[in-house]
């Protein structure tokens, strides 16, 4: 049953509450605001009693899907369960009641937390320094690319090209384009990894950097990464790592040890902050030693004196690329990531990645007999199936499979990405799911594979059990109607 809009529940004269009389004289708004700021007709606001308001939003919340409700298999999104202790740390008055314009001496605890988090992230990825400013992954990409650009400019080199592997997230070429680079695509080989021959052919004196995700979006580790790093560096270029898939690497290996010069982290993914509703995110950037002078300001520094240590925000970095956002990053996500890392420690972080890898390979082993596997096993933290078999044999597309999963009570996985996989189904179970949960999800996909053979029309009309049935997504994206007509 479709829930009505709050405006449709409105009835004239109904009120949620009313205020008792008081002895404060009533003031006419016309005497306070100029006429140009006043409405010419009453606002079209809903008139609904409190009980109906509460029930309306409770009903909507029950229809919502979130990681606290069930497994959230979005590939390349790392929708892990977020420990509630992280939220408790955020709610501490010493954090929640701060204002970013307070004097430094009154926010020493917050500065210490950010300073220590930067150090921990640098150690985890094997980088020399980290900035916490970027607001999310794509913002981190842009920050990293601007650092690369500044590095080349400081050396008198006006390089104009940036290489991006064809399996990359779409934000990679977008971020590079915003920074002013020409995007050159590097092909993947038959194994789903970077084609070294194509990379060699495209490396020239105009290439500023190669952007690479490791493991890549198919869930495969770039086993030739040391060779790739050598090729890039011998060309005078830098190597950038999209850290979207770092949940596979924690405590096992480090991007800095692979030869990456820049890496961004997605704290909301690998380091556990809620992001299913679209944010907030956090995309810190780690750099090698030679890029430190260009980091965004202000830089958090620790000062040692005979009286003890303190922390400050230093803007005196003349080679810096400047600020990447107001203030110091998405602070609440930084607190959650700090708490998560402190709770787990080095051993716990390694177990996170080990269990993520185990879960992905177990789930793949349950599914690869009924869905096509475009590239060979094993994978790391996620995998990519193809619905080509169902499409060719029964006319059932990956979109139909994803829609049918909604009827089984699951959020759909990422579909039609990466672009190098036809009819792609991209699944990332994360480390926080039990074997029983994985089995239930696998059974749903196996049942859907049976339905594709025996009841293809059911899949083509799915979902059939959800409050809202299949939408015309093309029309919805082209003819927006987001206003309520009173």
UniProtKB/Swiss-Prot annotation:
Required co-factor(s) are:
pyridoxal 5'-phosphate
Q: Which InterPro entries match?
A: Aminotrans_V_dom, GcvPB, GDC-P_C, GDC_P, PyrdxlP-dep_Trfase, PyrdxlP-dep_Trfase_major, PyrdxlP-dep_Trfase_small
- State a single Gene Ontology molecular function: pyridoxal phosphate binding
EC number, UniProt record: 1.4.4.2
Instruction: Using the record's annotations, give every residue carrying the modification N6-(pyridoxal phosphate)lysine.
Output: 269
Q: Does the keyword Oxidoreductase apply?
A: yes
* Keyword Lipid metabolism assigned: no
Question: Which BP terms does GO give this entry?
Answer: glycine decarboxylation via glycine cleavage system
Gene Ontology annotations for the cellular component aspect, listed alphabetically: cytosol; glycine cleavage complex
Q: Which SUPFAM superfamilies match?
A: PLP-dependent transferases
Query: What keywords are assigned to this protein?
Result: Oxidoreductase, Pyridoxal phosphate
Transmembrane portions of the chain:
none
| Catalysed reactions listed for this entry | N(6)-[(R)-lipoyl]-L-lysyl-[glycine-cleavage complex H protein] + glycine + H(+) = N(6)-[(R)-S(8)-aminomethyldihydrolipoyl]-L-lysyl-[glycine-cleavage complex H protein] + CO2
Signal peptide bounds: none
Family statement = Belongs to the GcvP family. C-terminal subunit subfamily.
Oligomeric and partner information: The glycine cleavage system is composed of four proteins: P, T, L and H. In this organism, the P 'protein' is a heterodimer of two subunits.
What is the purpose of this protein?
The glycine cleavage system catalyzes the degradation of glycine. The P protein binds the alpha-amino group of glycine through its pyridoxal phosphate cofactor; CO(2) is released and the remaining methylamine moiety is then transferred to the lipoamide cofactor of the H protein.
**NCBIfam families listed in its UniProt record:** PRK04366.1
How is this protein named in the record? Probable glycine dehydrogenase (decarboxylating) subunit 2
Per the UniProt entry, what species is this protein from, by scientific name? Chlorobium limicola (strain DSM 245 / NBRC 103803 / 6330)
Q: Which gene produces this protein?
A: gcvPB
């Amino acid at each position: 049953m479709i829930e009505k809009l709050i405006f449709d529940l409105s009835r004239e004269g109904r009120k949620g509450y009313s205020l008792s009389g008081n002895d404060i004289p009533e003031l006419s708004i016309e005497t306070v605001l100029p006429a140009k700021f006043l409405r010419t007709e009453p606002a079209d606001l809903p008139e609904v009693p409190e009980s109906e308001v509460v029930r309306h939003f409770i009903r909507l919340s029950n229809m919502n899907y979130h990681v606290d409700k069930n497994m959230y298999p979005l590939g390349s999104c790392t929708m892990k369960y977020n420990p509630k202790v992280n939220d408790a740390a955020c709610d501490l008055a010493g954090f929640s009641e701060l204002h970013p314009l307070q004097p430094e001496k009154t926010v020493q605890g917050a500065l210490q937390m950010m300073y220590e988090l930067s150090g921990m992230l640098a150690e985890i990825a094997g980088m020399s320094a980290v900035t916490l400013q970027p607001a999310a992954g794509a913002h981190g990409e842009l920050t990293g690319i601007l650092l690369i650009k500044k590095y080349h400019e400081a050396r008198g080199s006006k390089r104009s090209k940036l290489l991006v592997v064809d399996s990359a997230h779409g934000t990679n070429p977008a971020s590079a384009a915003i920074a002013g680079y020409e995007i050159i695509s590097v092909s993947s080989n038959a194994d789903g990894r970077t084609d070294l021959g194509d990379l060699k052919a495209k490396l020239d004196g105009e290439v500023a950097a190669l952007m690479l995700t490791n493991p890549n979006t198919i869930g495969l580790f770039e086993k030739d990464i040391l060779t790739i790093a050598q090729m890039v560096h011998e060309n005078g270029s830098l190597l950038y790592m999209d850290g979207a898939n770092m949940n596979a690497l924690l405590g096992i290996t480090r991007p800095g040890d692979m030869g990456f010069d820049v890496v961004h982290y997605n704290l909301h993914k690998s380091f556990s902050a809620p992001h299913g509703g679209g944010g907030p995110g956090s995309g810190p950037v780690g750099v090698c030693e030679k890029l430190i002078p260009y980091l965004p300001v202000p830089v958090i520094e620790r000062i040692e004196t005979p009286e003890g240590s303190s922390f400050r925000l230093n803007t005196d970095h003349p080679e810096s690329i400047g600020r990447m956002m107001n203030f110091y990053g998405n602070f609440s996500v930084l607190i959650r990531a700090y708490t998560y890392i402190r709770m787990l420690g080095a051993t716990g972080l390694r177990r996170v990645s080990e269990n993520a890898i185990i879960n992905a390979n177990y789930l793949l082993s349950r599914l690869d007999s009924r869905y096509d596997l475009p590239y060979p096993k094993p994978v790391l933290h996620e995998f990519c199936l193809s619905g080509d078999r169902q499409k060719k044999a029964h006319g059932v597309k990956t979109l139909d499979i994803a829609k049918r999963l909604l009827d089984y009570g699951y959020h759909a996985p990422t579909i039609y990405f990466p672009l190098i996989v036809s009819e792609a189904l991209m699944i990332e179970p994360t480390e926080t799911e039990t074997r029983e949960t994985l089995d239930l999800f696998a059974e749903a996909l196996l049942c859907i594979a049976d339905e594709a053979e025996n009841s293809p029309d059911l899949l083509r009309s799915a979902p059939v059990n959800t409050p809202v049935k299949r939408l015309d997504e093309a029309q919805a994206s082209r003819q927006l109607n987001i206003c309520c007509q009173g």
